[in-house]
Amino acid sequence: MASQVMRITLKAYDHELVDSSAKKIIETVKKNGSQVSGPVPLPTKKEVVTILRATHKYKDSREQFEQRTHKRLIDIINPTQKTTESLSRIEMPAGVYIDIKMKQK
């Protein structure tokens, strides 16, 4: 018997937004009676950009900016039609990227 798995990946620059969104998704799935695995924290991606403060010279004067991308992974095992409909109705905060994939296990 093959089971289906719905894999949800959440990405955002603010870790609190990712955690609150994951909590909303897990509460909704548990209300509908499906099994949940997660949230699994994935490695944080850190991007650093270095620029010169001055326009022409003074190479020793630099400034660094960084951007961190936080990720969480949630697996829903054997999702029902009711579960997928309720997930589509959830209000998510702006700034959270959601990627949903279905897999056969």
Swiss-Prot record:
GO terms for cellular component: ribonucleoprotein complex; ribosome. InterPro entries: Ribosomal_uS10, Ribosomal_uS10_CS, Ribosomal_uS10_dom, Ribosomal_uS10_dom_sf. This is Small ribosomal subunit protein uS10. It comes from Agathobacter rectalis (strain ATCC 33656 / DSM 3377 / JCM 17463 / KCTC 5835 / VPI 0990). The gene is rpsJ. GO terms for molecular function: structural constituent of ribosome; tRNA binding. Belongs to the universal ribosomal protein uS10 family. Part of the 30S ribosomal subunit. The lineage of its organism: Bacteria, Bacillati, Bacillota, Clostridia, Lachnospirales. Pfam families: Ribosomal_S10.
